[in-house]
């Protein structure tokens, strides 16, 4: 494998320390995969404040090196594109602080960083050749492959690490703290959990688990303002709004090309929520109704035909982009509405508006379904207060020093790790407010500080380590204000993006909410369940996507509805619902 494909980065206290004092934790050396590599060095470390007692290695200043295989995470900031390997190579005070804190736990990291677009292939190659990393990002592997690794004894249970090798902090966190739910929800049939994942927790003013951010269908507020229109509140009014946009050539293109971005093959675009139907993402046919604790499918919902008829009417009127070219048409100032995180501002970036026109501005809308067969209140997509991520990080059987892994886990659940990951360094990437809030330094010149102002550290979010995000009520209030304030530098110096913040102010206590993702926190499927899922998913998904698309485009008739439902049942939709219900019940401790 070429050096351009893999960047092997060793984080060591010194070359002498490596050669004279310690062998690496993994049984395979850094060159055991037969690849060329680039190596760099930096002082490793971390914090020990929350560990009950220093380990012997920490007390004597000794450091054990753990090898982690993961993605070389990249991001684009004002200074240009940056990557985790850039940080490791030097020049990032935030990463240097991460290394220093980690060393206080007696741990250093050797990183095998692989470009994201090559990672899945490298993972599969690594499995065939033999795993040589102590910890591995196994996110790209499918469920069956992960179960096979467990059956083959190639993954060490997280239970073993935290119960027998933690010095206290990780054991408490995953036994009695916020990680206990994760351990229960991700447990396999043997009762053990074999990978860590990200945990996001949003607290309310009583420091209890509340709710997170929201996703919403959004419409161009600047176009509404240009025509003196109020935001639509019903699906009928959305039709009238689109008619006004096109008839008045609101984007000044000379053509009736103002359109909505709506997926025609699945229920991921947010409009189905206004009919009381839960959101399913591409390739998924069920969702969890957290109000009732039941797994449902959009196809069996009482308002499904009404939803299809509405979207078809939008398409027939020429109000929907059927080209699947969202980014291109958005940049060309043609996308009138889309679905995304309600407060974020990245959709406005890169849109070119005519000279003299107001800057692009997407504002959330909540629509009551005018043609619903069964009247319902609009449902909103909200992130749950306790949210597990989709990334997976496993300890492999190649690791020879689980005590070092236990100390690493102790660091991961510490406030030091969380603050470095989310905010970086005080007075470098954030300032601490009198009310205890973390305020990003928005005009930082350093690229790593710019990244922390826009997101989180590059070592997490599908890179090498899990993310533990804890938002206090004050953090959330600061973030909400940030949504509005962002608009002050994006064309609205007086008001900012006030409609984005107003949405949260108005709907935070709204009664009718469903998770923003289709199937939150399903327990891992059993081998038997996986066999069934694998045998039915391909044909079932293909049929569903083709059917929905053809019904919306008028290529198939709604008159044959009973036949379609019989086909879905025959292809296994009822089986899929039953399996996912059992998985949800297990995750909730009800089975």
PLM feature segments, named:
Residues 1-12:
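Bacterial N-terminal signal peptides that target proteins for export
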Residues 20-24:
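C-terminal motif of bacterial Sec signal peptides marking the signal peptidase cleavage site
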Residues 72-101, 146-148, 202-218, 225-231, 265-474, ...:
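Extracytoplasmic/periplasmic substrate-binding proteins
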């Amino acid at each position: 494998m070429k050096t351009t494909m893999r960047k092997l980065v060793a984080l060591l206290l010194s070359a002498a320390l490596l050669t004279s004092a310690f062998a690496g934790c993994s049984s395979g050396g850094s060159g055991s995969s037969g690849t060329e590599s680039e190596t760099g060095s930096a002082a490793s470390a971390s914090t020990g404040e929350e560990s009950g007692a220093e380990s012997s290695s920490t007390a004597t200043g000794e450091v054990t090196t753990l090898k982690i295989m993961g993605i070389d995470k990249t991001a684009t900031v004002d200074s240009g594109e940056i990557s985790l390997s850039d940080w490791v190579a030097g020049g990032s005070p935030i990463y240097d602080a991460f290394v220093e804190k980690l060393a206080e736990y007696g741990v250093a990291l050797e990183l095998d960083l692989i470009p994201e677009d090559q990672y899945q292939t490298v993972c599969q190659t690594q499995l065939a050749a033999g795993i040589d990393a102590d910890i591995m990002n196994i996110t790209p592997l499918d469920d069956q492959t992960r179960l096979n690794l467990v059956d083959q004894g190639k993954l060490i249970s997280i239970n073993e690490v935290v119960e027998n090798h933690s010095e206290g902090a990780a054991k408490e966190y995953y036994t009695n703290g916020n990680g206990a739910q994760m351990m229960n929800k991700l447990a396999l049939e043997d009762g053990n959990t074999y990978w860590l994942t990200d945990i996001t927790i949003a607290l309310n003013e009583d420091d209890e688990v509340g709710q997170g951010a929201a996703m919403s269908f959004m419409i161009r507020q600047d176009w509404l303002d240009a025509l003196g229109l109020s935001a639509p509140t019903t699906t009928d009014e959305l039709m009238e709004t689109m008619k006004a946009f096109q008839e008045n050539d609101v984007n000044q293109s000379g053509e009736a090309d103002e359109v909505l971005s709506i997926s025609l093959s699945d229920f991921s675009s947010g409009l189905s929520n206004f009919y009381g139907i839960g959101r399913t993402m591409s390739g998924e046919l069920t969702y969890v109704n957290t109000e009732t604790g039941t797994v449902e499918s959009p196809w069996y919902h009482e308002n499904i035909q009404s939803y299809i008829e509405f979207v078809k009417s939008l398409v027939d009127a020429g109000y929907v982009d059927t080209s699947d070219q969202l980014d291109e048409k958005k940049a060309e100032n043609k996308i009138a509405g889309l679905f995304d995180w309600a407060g974020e501002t990245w959709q406005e970036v890169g849109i070119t508006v005519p000279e003299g026109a107001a800057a692009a501005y997407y504002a959330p809308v909540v629509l009551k379904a005018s043609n619903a067969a069964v009247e319902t209140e609009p449902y909103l997509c909200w992130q749950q207060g306790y949210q597990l991520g989709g990334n997976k990080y496993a300890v492999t059987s190649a690791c020879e020093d689980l005590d070092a892994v236990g100390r690493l886990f102790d660091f991961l659940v510490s406030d030091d790790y969380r603050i470095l990951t989310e905010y970086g360094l005080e007075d470098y990437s954030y300032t601490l407010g009198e009310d205890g809030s973390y305020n990003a330094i928005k005009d930082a010149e350093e690229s790593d500080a710019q990244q922390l102002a826009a997101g989180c550290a590059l070592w997490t979010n599908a890179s090498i380590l899990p993310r533990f995000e804890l938002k206090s009520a004050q953090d959330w209030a600061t973030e909400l204000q940030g949504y509005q304030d962002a608009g002050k530098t994006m064309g609205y110096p007086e008001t900012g993006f006030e409609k984005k913040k107003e949405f949260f102010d108005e709907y935070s206590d709204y009664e009718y909410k469903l998770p923003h993702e289709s199937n939150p926190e399903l327990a891992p499927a059993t081998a038997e369940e996986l066999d069934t899922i694998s045998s039915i998913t391909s044909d079932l998904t293909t049929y569903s996507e083709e059917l929905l698309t053809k019904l919306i485009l008028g290529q198939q008739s709604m008159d044959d509805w009973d036949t379609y439902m019989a086909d879905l049942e025959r292809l296994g939709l009822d089986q899929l619902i039953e399996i996912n219900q059992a998985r949800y019940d297990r995750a909730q401790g009800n089975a």
